């Protein structure tokens, strides 16, 4: 569900204190803010209000979008005892019940609202923050298949790459749904899931969902897009960068398959690409060993967990 906060500085404050809640309780809950003169005012004013509900069904905070053109456009509850944006996903209380085989991870709460209204009850959002280890642990309780559907601007592309890096050694099967840019007055502008559904409809989104790339294909395409593969120097640079990605893949079969595809893209033999990946793999192992040695020599670092990649064995 959703609601709205009135265009008032103290409507919630007056209502809640009238019902017996103290100002300190409202402050602790992130519903009011203290000013410099010692007074208090409502945090959320003239906003569309979206309750954030945890997987147990409890309201733990709020997301919001301004109704007029004032700033900030989006605002969430501040960190509280019950609400930590690193540890919660908007819409997961509903998406955990989906019959679909995967969960769609979006950027914004309104993306989730629109997708659910369109029949995609497997959509969640990361509350305006980059995907965190804590959120992936939460997701792993309900699915092993993720579809990343971030905005198609530069920030969204960067968020996708960071999420893929975080999920690289996880047990998730990860795909990327790339939303096309929208042509308006001769210029291409960004588009999010909310925009796309409203303009193109659920069937068009379903087609994009079915055609989602896996995470490795997406990252390889991003790397290839940086280089003119008709130029020899660019091809060499591409091979060096893509080999680092391929060397990070956990499975030998997976490395073999994508090494062949990278070789084809670069116009070289699979054997030459394989040698480049092997060199990158050896450099990667050497870097990890040096990092472990530095950690062992530093007492403070030695206290940190040695395994930094994502694992779910203890969940």
Per-range role (PLM):
Residues 1-7, 237:
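Conserved alpha/beta enzyme-core scaffolds, especially Rossmann-like or related mixed alpha/beta domains
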Residues 8-142, 146, 158-160:
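Phosphate-handling DNA/RNA-contact segment within nucleic-acid enzymes
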Residues 3, 106, 126, 150-151, ...:
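Conserved residues at beta->alpha junctions
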Residues 2, 62, 151, 179:
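Cofactor-binding loop segments of dinucleotide-utilizing enzymes, especially the Rossmann-like FAD-
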Residues 1-2, 20-28, 33-37, 205, ...:
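Short, surface-exposed acidic
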Residues 54-56, 96-103, 130-146, 153-315:
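A charged alpha-helical hairpin associated with nucleic-acid processing machineries
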